[in-house]
């Protein structure tokens, strides 16, 4: 949508004969800016996260009021034909920016960049990460103490606001809608994951698992189907799940594995992870569809300036709707891919062509989350094999019995058991679709990659 916006703002006008045709009702709904629905300001985790770093206890009401004022100011200022520039929007929407300075912010305190420098189990297949965490337990616990207020704030947000509904500023201001401080979520998670290992190592297994379960439920909240997430939210959830999965994999390789496997709450944790596995794919599809439709918010002033005809826009909407419907059913079907390639062939309007060629569906967001889910499922399968003591010779049949849980949705290839390496793997994965933590350990070359986890020898 950002690329489309810049292209539209930068192009000069040209004349297209307007047909005497009405806009499709669905198109009119998409392109018409609307006043803010104030009901969406209530009990909304998006607003809570947006204001989570505001230091005062009334952070939610303050943020809600500021967002509403900025939205209303932009809405009232929207011209019929021309578009507001980013400079004009910044001069109009002032209330949220004021919050950064008037009362101060809750900021992540890590002056020595411990979390950034010490990747710990954030590094893919680091066989020593559990020991490294235990060696650094005093630094980890100090980090938690220094950030106690910020951590409590985010705990409160997810406890009090289970549902998120992303709100965008109207029309061209949509690309300038402020977003939550996602880096805080990641930093807090990394510190709490490391502390869960410390707790388990100290014999406080209940507390360690409770921390892990809290984080898994937090991720699950971010991919609930009953909410309207933006695409960034969904991708952040996938990144958080990858980190958690790597910690679980490391714990299953550690000296604490048997104790965890016998703990009922650890079983509850692993089952909670399957809620994420069931929801991440459809949630990503919904977010992609919403992101794709956001491109239409730009087209009302373009229609008014006669740079685009009603016929062209109606036809383009129908084509994109066909594509989106196929993606919702089976995005990896050859028919869908063929339609993607052919969608732009009959599109002649320059503005529509730019949006068509930069389709959000082709960037790889869905593939990244599906590959992450593959890794997540591998860790879950590893847990099941260890929990139920599946014998090596029975593992191939066990994997087959798990159905889609052991099949990559992109290639439809099954996971493979290698008895010599004691690994479950998936080969032929594109580097660009791997989670960021895994890409760090693999060379970016033309060769397809192998995703895998290793089953330790019998406990």
Task: List the predicted regions and their residue ranges.
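Short acidic linear motifs
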Residues: 14-459
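Classical Sec-dependent N-terminal signal peptides that target proteins to the secretory pathway
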Residues: 1-18
């Amino acid at each position: 949508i950002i690329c489309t916006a810049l292209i539209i703002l930068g192009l000069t006008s040209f004349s297209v004969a307007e047909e005497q045709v009405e806009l499709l009702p669905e198109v009119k709904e998409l392109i018409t800016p609307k006043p803010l629905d104030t009901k969406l300001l209530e009990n909304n985790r998006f607003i809570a996260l947006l204001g989570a770093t505001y230091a005062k206890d009334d952070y939610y009401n303050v943020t809600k009021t500021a967002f509403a004022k900025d939205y209303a100011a932009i809405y009232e200022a929207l011209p019929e034909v021309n578009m507001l520039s980013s400079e004009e929007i910044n001069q109009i929407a002032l209330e949220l920016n004021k919050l950064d300075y008037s009362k101060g912010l809750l900021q992540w305190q890590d002056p020595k960049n411990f979390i950034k420098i010490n990747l710990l189990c954030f590094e893919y297949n680091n066989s020593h990460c559990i020991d490294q965490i235990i060696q650094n337990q005093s630094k980890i616990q100090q980090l938690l103490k220094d950030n106690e207020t910020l951590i409590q704030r985010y705990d409160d947000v997810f406890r009090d606001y289970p549902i998120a509904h992303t709100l965008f500023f109207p029309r061209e201001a949509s690309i300038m809608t402020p977003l939550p401080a996602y880096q805080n979520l990641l930093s807090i998670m990394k510190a709490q994951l490391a502390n869960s290992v410390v707790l388990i190592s100290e014999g406080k297994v209940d507390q360690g698992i409770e921390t892990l379960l809290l984080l898994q439920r937090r991720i699950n909240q971010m991919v609930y189907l009953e909410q309207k997430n933006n695409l960034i939210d969904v991708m952040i959830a996938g990144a958080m799940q990858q980190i958690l999965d790597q910690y679980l994999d490391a714990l299953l390789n550690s000296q604490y594995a048997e104790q965890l496997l016998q703990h009922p709450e650890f079983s509850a944790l692993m089952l909670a992870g399957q809620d994420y596995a069931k929801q991440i794919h459809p949630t990503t599809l919904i977010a992609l569809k919403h992101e794709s439709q956001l491109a239409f918010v730009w087209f009302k002033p373009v229609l008014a300036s006669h740079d685009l005809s009603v016929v062209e826009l109606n036809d383009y909407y129908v084509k994109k709707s066909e594509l989106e419907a196929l993606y919702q059913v089976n995005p990896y079907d050859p028919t869908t891919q063929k339609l993607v390639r052919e969608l732009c062939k009959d599109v002649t309007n320059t503005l529509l062509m730019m949006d068509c060629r930069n389709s959000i569906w082709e960037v790889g967001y869905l593939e990244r989350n599906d590959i992450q889910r593959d890794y997540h499922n591998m860790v879950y399968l590893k847990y099941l094999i260890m929990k139920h003591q599946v014998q090596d010779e029975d593992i191939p049949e066990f994997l087959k019995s798990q159905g889609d849980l052991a099949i990559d949705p992109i290639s439809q290839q099954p996971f493979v058991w290698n008895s010599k390496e004691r690994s479950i793997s998936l080969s032929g994965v594109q580097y660009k679709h791997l989670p960021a933590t895994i890409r760090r350990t693999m060379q970016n070359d033309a060769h397809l990659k192998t995703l895998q986890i290793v089953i330790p020898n019998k406990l």
